[in-house]
Amino acid sequence: MHARLKFTLATMLMTLPFSSSTRADDPPAAPVAATNAPGALAPNGYSSGEATHVRLVAIVQSANSEGRSRARIERIATSRRGTAIEVIVLGEQDSTKKQPAMLLVGGMDGVDLASTEQVLAALNTLQRDHAELLKTMRIYAIAEANPDARADAINSHTPRATNAREVDDDRDGAIDEDAPRDINGDGLITSMRRVAPAGRSATHVVDAADARITRAAKKDKGEVATHELFVEGLDIDGDGLLSEDALGGVALDHNFAHRYPEFAVDAGPYQMSEPEAMGIARFVRDHSDIVSAIVFGRHDTLVNFPDTKDKDSTSRTPMCYLAEDHDMYRAMAKLFKESTKLEKSDSADLAGSLVLWLANHRGIAAVAVNGWTRPLAPDLAEGAPAAVETGDADEAAWLAVSDRLYGGAGFDAWTTEQHPKLGVVEVGGFLPFFKSCPTIAQAETLAVATTPFVAKLAELTPRITVSDARLTPISNGLVRIDLRVTNTGTLATTTEMGRITQMIPPIVLRVIGNPSDVLSGKAIEKIERLEAGASNEYSWTVRVQDGASVQITVIGPNFDTITRTAAPASSATQPGTEAPR
């Protein structure tokens, strides 16, 4: 199967199992119950672009009400179609005042539309209910990282993982000329199947227990494939392939540098080739105050913790998280489950993802949140026939959800159509978005569930305190100076991976004066990493004039400069104080 067709099946139409139109000899489907369905299927109710900007403006206005100045919107990049990619800065607005910060990102694609709702809900709750937290912690939030994909998905009612880059997927000199097309006129892109004619390779069978399901033949059980399966579309370019040159593009979560999947059709021509990805990368590079990050979307590292300690062929690069950081990430996963009560979540391949780039290239404590999975189907009504056992339990479970929770709205019954190239085909299957994205009502519920975790993770920060500088005379103008630096916070100053990559600036202690007067100890000391609750002790032997004092400064990426003065006993000394956060 062509690479783009595989990609389309895996992402755009990940919502679709496949079956045949009902015939008289088919076993009856489970009875459709009149239930309180959780609202219209996605993308109904979702918004993008200008509507998202309006919601961000409302958050800023609320945060800045009553004479406060706690929020602003900045443009950090422009999409390929010219749409602004915006970040909202929530908390202290004086950029010269250094504080720890958390990064929130959503809207990386047009498949998981709920991620933007999760970011916006978190922002609303933080500005409304966590005023004290915002005095000591900044929040940077990007609600729509890939606005073009989100807008296309909503407007076309078809999931789209990629941005608007034009790509000649099938290398025929034409761009995006053979995208999926609506054959039966129902306004949706679903699937087509047909009995494989002579000379073609059949791959699937119609399930004997439930004819709505078309599944791969189980050759180990002697099944013989009878059907071909396609994404709904036409062979516009006459190359014998259907829907293989779809619109776009590059998936942003395959475009980042860590484990960049260079041969994937949706990875882009090179790492961070896309303006959306580069805009995020530059923003992160320019904000070394970021200590933690949550990327909402198709990935999950909290419910399904990636426990692997494997490294790549160099034996240096972790496939997911560095083993030495696992305890920290496990603690975050536990916090997530306790905060949200979510025990199941979908996920996706992390290769080339933003979350792994943040964690392994930037040294930020970064996690991925999805939280969405197949809903539970209500029990069958009393007296209803028991559900039949099919050859594909997962597809049958989704059918049960459609039948019992959505009143059958999740599945488009197969109908016979005359295809201009294939002849007689059946068109139908699960509706786009049904399996990949919650309804807007479900997304709002999910956002309420994940917001407490955002607030609790924001409370996990390093906090540097510096003791008073103690001066002890030795003799002949020589003094000893002692100082202690402590991390009284709940997070290390950087991850162990951050210490290795050295992308997060270290904490720097500097003895002010002529370096040649520092006779023992280093005039400049660096703390690459300080665990939560840990302390470092420092001593210097310094040559001073009679009665003179010595100043030591402590500088870090997420606290204002701290100055301590070591003075003779007759002079006033400053007590140790906590670093501004």
List the predicted regions and their residue ranges.
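Short glycine- and acidic-rich boundary segments immediately preceding or forming the N-terminal edge
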Residues: 28-84, 445
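Active-site/substrate-binding loop(s) of hydrolase catalytic cores
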Residues: 98-99, 113-117, 121-321
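Intrinsically disordered, low-complexity Pro/Gly/Ser/Thr-rich segments with frequent PxxP/GP/PP motifs
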Residues: 517-545
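Short, aromatic- and glycine-rich surface loops/edge beta-strands on solvent-exposed regions
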Residues: 548-557
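Bacterial N-terminal signal peptides
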Residues: 8-17
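Edge beta-strands of extracellular beta-sandwich domains
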Residues: 559-572
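Short amphipathic, basic-aromatic surface patches that mediate peripheral association
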Residues: 485-499
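Metallocarboxypeptidase
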Residues: 72, 84, 140-142, 248-474, ...
